[in-house]
């Protein structure tokens, strides 16, 4: 199961000596030693938890779940990412050592899912916060699909060049989502917020111990004054 074709490895010479490069050797060593950081916020994470059991046995891929981002090289986001949790997710990603990879699991993580229509607190895709290597659609994806995503990621690792991976880090995207809510007649007289969010993701240094949420999202709230009597 762990066998992987290694395209960059040179053929064995007549003297039975295998010649390769340091980059190829590094990629080969990381194929069966991916240490994931499990970032589960919703029901998709239950499907990933089933991989730990004996039926699917993800240990055969060399996956060792870690609880610290400083010891992980893969973060698997499963579930809805809210704007309140976005700074924490970016901070976890920045604390991971290079090279690092991201698997976006589930429709809610990739596009916001059913919450993307008119939700004031849902991020429309985790790729607006961190770069994604493998997209895994589904609601929720099956455990077999997760294993297929891990296999595709391992193929990508076997073919990449370390210097290119470091140099091609994508910058955080900027996006704006406007929400306009109308006050229902049954709520007239109550305190209601009509919020217009201008969300700009600001690049932060990985050495920053704490990243405040106000550095990521700027809120412009218009609060109408109603008679509370």
UniProtKB/Swiss-Prot annotation:
[4Fe-4S] cluster binds at residues 43-44, 108, 139. The keyword Iron applies. It is found in: Plastid, Chloroplast thylakoid membrane. InterPro entries: NADH_UbQ_OxRdtase-like_20kDa, NADH_UQ_OxRdtase_20Kd_su. It catalyses: a plastoquinone + NADH + (n+1) H(+)(in) = a plastoquinol + NAD(+) + n H(+)(out); a plastoquinone + NADPH + (n+1) H(+)(in) = a plastoquinol + NADP(+) + n H(+)(out). Its EC number is 7.1.1.-. Its main location: plastid. Its cofactor is [4Fe-4S] cluster. One of its GO terms (cellular component) is chloroplast thylakoid membrane. GO terms for biological process: aerobic respiration; electron transport coupled proton transport; photosynthesis, light reaction. It is a peripheral membrane protein. GO terms for molecular function: 4 iron, 4 sulfur cluster binding; iron ion binding; NADH dehydrogenase (ubiquinone) activity; quinone binding. Binds 1 [4Fe-4S] cluster. Coiled coil: none annotated. The keyword Translocase applies. It comes from the Eukaryota. It is an enzyme of class 7 (translocase). Keywords: 4Fe-4S, Chloroplast, Iron, Iron-sulfur, Membrane, Metal-binding, NAD, NADP, Plastid, Plastoquinone, Quinone, Thylakoid, Translocase, Transport. Transmembrane segments: none annotated. NDH is composed of at least 16 different subunits, 5 of which are encoded in the nucleus. Belongs to the complex I 20 kDa subunit family. NDH shuttles electrons from NAD(P)H:plastoquinone, via FMN and iron-sulfur (Fe-S) centers, to quinones in the photosynthetic chain and possibly in a chloroplast respiratory chain. The immediate electron acceptor for the enzyme in this species is believed to be plastoquinone. Couples the redox reaction to proton translocation, and thus conserves the redox energy in a proton gradient. This is NAD(P)H-quinone oxidoreductase subunit K, chloroplastic. It comes from Piper cenocladum. The gene is ndhK.
């Amino acid at each position: 199961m762990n066998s992987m074709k290694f395209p960059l490895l040179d053929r064995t010479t007549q003297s039975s000596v295998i010649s390769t490069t340091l980059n190829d050797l590094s990629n080969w060593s990381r194929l069966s030693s991916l240490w994931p950081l499990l970032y589960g916020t919703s029901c998709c994470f239950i499907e990933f938890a089933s991989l730990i059991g004996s039926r699917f046995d993800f240990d055969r891929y060399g996956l060792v779940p870690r609880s610290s981002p400083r010891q992980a090289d893969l973060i698997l986001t499963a579930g809805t990412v809210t704007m309140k949790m976005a700074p924490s997710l970016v901070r976890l990603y920045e604390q991971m050592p290079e090279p690092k990879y991201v698997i976006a699991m589930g429709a809610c993580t990739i596009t916001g899912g059913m919450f993307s229509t008119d939700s004031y607190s849902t991020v429309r895709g985790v790729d607006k916060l961190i770069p994604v290597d493998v997209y895994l659609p589904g609601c929720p994806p099956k455990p077999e699909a997760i294993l297929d995503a891990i296999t595709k990621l391992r193929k990508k690792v076997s073919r990449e060049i370390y210097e290119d991976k470091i140099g091609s880090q994508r910058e955080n995207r900027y996006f704006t989502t406007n929400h306009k809510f109308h006050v229902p007649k049954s709520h007239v007289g109550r305190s209601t917020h009509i919020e217009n969010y201008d969300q700009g993701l600001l690049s932060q240094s990985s050495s920053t111990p704490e990243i405040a949420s106000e550095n990521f999202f700027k809120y412009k709230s218009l609060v109408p004054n109603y008679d509370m009597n």
